[in-house]
Design a protein with these regions (language model features):
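Intrinsically disordered, low-complexity regulatory regions in eukaryotic proteins
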Residues: 24-111, 124, 128-201
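Short proline/glycine- and polar residue-rich coil/turn motifs
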Residues: 114-122
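C-terminal motif of bacterial Sec signal peptides marking the signal peptidase cleavage site
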Residues: 19-22
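Generic alpha-helix detector with strongest preference for long hydrophobic helices that associate
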Residues: 4, 58, 108, 118-119
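Bacterial N-terminal signal peptides that target proteins for export
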Residues: 1-10
Length: 201
């Protein structure tokens, strides 16, 4: 029995050595080319976290469920490609023909000039939106579009399911799904909660 165990151990060592010798070390190729940039806004269930939430095509602020007269909106912009050791500016513009929100009255605090800072792979675009009288019967919309500049390109026409993230993209408002574009919708209309019948509302 002892000889059998010894032969088995030798056999396993020989097989292990052959497997290791058969391995070939390959270098991981570095990304080459212009890095991509896109809106990577995420939100979802409170029991999750940002790394798991699905990518969303729009942000919705419902003043009907808030007591506040204003709300902060944060939109994450991500990159595909390499992290750099220097700042990389880009622009975000408001698409006027797809926007009906009134500047300074219904939103403020937005800056077109943005930057992906050195050592980072994302940035946050922020603004503040306000409750106004017309929002009790109308929905305001602001459409934002990325202008990539010299450091980035817009390589995607759409972004599908991102591995490791939940697949619960919201569809209450129709959007084109272009990752270079993000819409912000806000109103003061109380929506019927999911699961409520018409006679309970």
């Amino acid at each position: 029995m002892k000889i059998y165990t010894c032969k088995l151990m030798i056999f396993l060592w020989v097989i292990g050595g052959l497997l290791v010798a058969g391995c070939e070390r390959k270098e991981v190729m570095e990304y080459e080319g212009v890095d991509g940039i896109y809106f990577d806004v995420q939100y979802g269930a409170s029991h999750g976290n940002e790394s798991l939430w699905a990518r969303q095509n729009y942000t919705y602020v419902s003043f009907g469920t808030l007591e506040a007269e204003e709300a902060d909106v944060t939109m994450k912009v991500g990159i595909s490609g390499s992290i750099k050791d220097y700042d990389r500016p880009f622009r975000v513009e408001i698409v006027q023909d797809s926007t009906n929100a009134i500047p300074e009255e219904e939103y403020t605090g937005f800056t077109e000039e943005q930057v992906i800072k050195a050592g980072e792979n994302h940035a946050y675009v922020t603004l503040k939106v306000f409750r106004t009288a017309r929002l009790t019967h109308d929905t305001a919309r602001i459409q934002f579009r990325i202008e990539p500049g010299e450091h980035f390109t817009l390589p995607f026409s759409e972004v599908g399911q991102i591995p490791g993230r939940w697949n619960d993209t919201k569809t209450q408002f129709a959007t084109g799904g272009d990752p270079a574009v993000h819409d912000v919708f806000f109103n003061n209309i109380l929506q019927r909660p999911l699961g409520w019948g018409a006679n309970e509302y």
